[in-house]
């Protein structure tokens, strides 16, 4: 019987009031803890975003459009490796090791971070093999990247590991260490006459290694690459699909980057990356908030499932509105003089400014898709999220190349925007189907308390 249905003279009324008060306190505590974790996530993303923006600005100032284009291709390749690493290692960690006992978390982190390092080693070897084919400026950028990819993957895995445990402050500190060592390293290289794309790319990865070592000390856990196969086998139901999903997302960017270079020239890649720099804080926030929202969604799904769809809608609303607001600020509130200063010269600003509109449309679409994608991952609906990713990726890649041929630099970004908006619609359709299935499964479980107890005992 609910507390509201008990009259004040009922003997059980005091007990009901106590239970109701405790429930309200529990809900308030849950909300407070969620906001605290989200706050650390926003702070961590701010550090990551500002570091990436500062690095991009410094590189374009120091190297010029052509070398910055080569650096951008290396960054796109890094994103490809990063999505592969996350899909195989930290995405399953976030789904299955959020809100678990510390001993279980340490066991999962030991294997997940080791897997991330192994993925970095494999992709690094492949990147170094590509150096002989590329040569020139692009080859120099890929050489610096290939030598440091294992360190970059390991550093990224610590961020996800800390957020899975609700330790956002540790992730914030780790990213701060990377930023605090990276920017001085770039300045030192320029002062000593080593301002070229190889040394800048190498310094970017080497300083990530410093943060990766700091992550080991923070967690008190040593990565175990030897357990990579064991981790992959145990989580292949999620890892395989997340790998394909992340690889597709990165492949679209690879196709866009290389296609733009072939069709429009290497400088055009630099202009596109410069526009990404302008919307950088929102782009990184939209794509990176999953390290906060995914474990948070997993916690809410376990503890307060009725609030789960609301949380996913709020994620999409917040990210899409933030992206729209930032785009408006760039279009209306940023004087051209500031744009020249940020990008280094009017020669870079002039072709970059028109790209802000399609970039904003792209970012808003990504924000709308984010909530549904988070929900699908938290529910373990990897098959449904993969289906949405495949359709969106095919549309984005084809439209991006067609747009580059027909409409130049703007067309390639509008093509990506079409793909991400179609993907957002499919994501929400799949989310609705997955949530209906989850509710039906939960209803069946509640009707069979014995089965539910056996399931819970098995999980423990």
Language-model segments: which ranges?
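Interfacial transmembrane-helix starts/ends
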Residues: 34-35, 97, 101-118, 236, ...
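Interfacial segments at transmembrane-helix termini and the short loops linking adjacent helices
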Residues: 131-145, 332-364, 410
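Helix-loop junctions and terminal segments of transmembrane helices
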Residues: 52, 83-102, 275, 279-305, ...
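Interhelical loop/hinge segments that connect adjacent transmembrane helices in multipass membrane
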Residues: 18-30, 34, 169-174, 193-201, ...
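Membrane-interface junctions at transmembrane-helix termini in multi-pass inner-membrane proteins
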Residues: 151-173, 361-390
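Transmembrane helical elements of multi-pass membrane transporters/channels
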Residues: 36-53, 177-182, 200-219, 223, ...
